[in-house]
Amino acid sequence: MTTQTFDYIIIGAGSAGNVLAARLTEDADVSVLLLEAGGPDYRLDFRTQMPAALAYPLQGRRYNWAYLTEPEPHMNNRRMECGRGKGLGGSSLINGMCYIRGNAMDLEGWSKLKGLENWTYADCLPYYKKAETRDIGGNDYHGDHGPVSVATPKDNNNVLFHAMVEAGVQAGYPRTDDLNGYQQEGFGPMDRTVTKNGRRSSTARGYLDMAKERPNLTIITHAMTNKILFNGKQAIGVEYIQGADKRDLKKVMANKEVLLCAGAIASPQILQRSGVGESTFLKSMDIDVVHDLPGVGENLQDHLEMYLQYKCKQPVSLYPALKWYNQPAIGAEWLFLGKGIGASNQFEAGGFIRSSDEFEWPNIQYHFLPVAINYNGSNAVKEHGFQAHVGSMRSPSRGHIKLKSKDPFEHPSILFNYMSTEQDWQEFRAAIRITREIMHQPALDPYRGEEISPGKQLSTDTQLDDFVRNHAETAYHPSCSCKMGEDDMAVVDHQGRVHGLQGLRVVDASIMPLIITGNLNATTIMMAEKIADQIRERAPLPRSDAPFYVASA
């Protein structure tokens, strides 16, 4: 049987891979193969398509890799969840659909690193806009012709959203009408990646739907990448397994480039399995070294968060929606009308604040939710309630990803090393105390009952630290494990090209040099849009001159 050859092979049909597949195949003379280890994004499966059902995919294995960390030493040795998307759409198929770009100062910080001078906010904003269609139209900060549908909260949504934003303002923090606009600090409405018909706007729906009928795009699902193939230092193809038979290895060849888009956990794992990584470690795993690159799998970062939960004195929360006998009507309204509770992720308000003046831009994020429940759908409080998700944004803690074996089906060793610095503890103590202050503002007086969690009896540093150690959870934002840059631990350059190799790029959240202030999906899509132009050797989009807010010191 002849080996198939394509111009480009993309590994991973996720938030970045689907962008590349769609953009590269706009050139009709270019052939692209898209390999995805998971299955299709079944459009009739409410678990991934209904925004309010976002907890369901995290409870199963069909759409979730369901990684676990090693025992985290500063978190009572808990093995913590690290859910990642599996299937067309990747993590955009199972995420919380919060459309948050981070802060302009994140990108300004990246651009100060050697070699990353073209990653300023002015360089990147045009690519955020290119990807977006916002339901209320475009402006200097937002797009109106992009593949990703973005929905804005409406004034008649749950009263608790408005009360929580108002409470934040009463506590002395700014108000903003657009967390992705001029002022990315303060409390306000939070946009979401949802279509006008109330469906999840994953990159499979947004990008693959416009590209999958093109004759120059081939998509193979249930294709687990074993390794990238090299001729010397040149990436020339990919070896993958389709189905469960590990002996059934298939090879495909790339004329131009292999584009690794498997995410912050799997991309370094695939590189290591392919012989790219720290050479001593690779030899210890009996892997032939193709290229010694010590930064592969290092610099791993994430956001940690916790829930502060309160009883609600008025019957205005979403608690009734958790009752089985109310769910058929909610489901029908969503299915047939694309409206109602089912059409929202229910993260319609939130914000970013600075816990102290030492921070130049916000270091704490809030998501407000008008029901008291864990993100993965567990431990729902059996009465009316509401909660704030709160966590620090730029932890100094660093972790790593390491292979456990050469078996592509074995999950790697993951250690985030959460809460390993004194700054982490200071920020989380401050976050709890600030949240309590916000929750006790007059705007919430009509609604706020007693504090369910952590519970008002916990107030000392030691008590709060114990609560964080035992109850903080991932915000599902792993990143930075194949970082961009030019220092000794950088894995790729400013265009995602792997240092020391030819014909190989990494394009996903793993190449962020530093984690951003907020949810990762919008920025991952932006990065893929930007690098797609570089792969196609197109001129970059004109830089934006839109201003952005920076708090005065």
UniProtKB/Swiss-Prot annotation:
Q: Which cofactor does it need?
A: FAD
Q: Which species?
A: Acinetobacter baylyi (strain ATCC 33305 / BD413 / ADP1)
Task: State the taxonomy lineage.
Answer: Bacteria, Pseudomonadati, Pseudomonadota, Gammaproteobacteria, Moraxellales
What this protein catalyses is: choline + A = betaine aldehyde + AH2; betaine aldehyde + NAD(+) + H2O = glycine betaine + NADH + 2 H(+)
Pathway listed for it is: Amine and polyamine biosynthesis; betaine biosynthesis via choline pathway; betaine aldehyde from choline (cytochrome c reductase route): step 1/1
Name by which UniProt lists this protein: Oxygen-dependent choline dehydrogenase
Give a GO biological-process term. Answer: glycine betaine biosynthetic process from choline
Indicate the residues that form the catalytic site.
Answer: 477
Any GO CC annotation of this UniProt entry: membrane
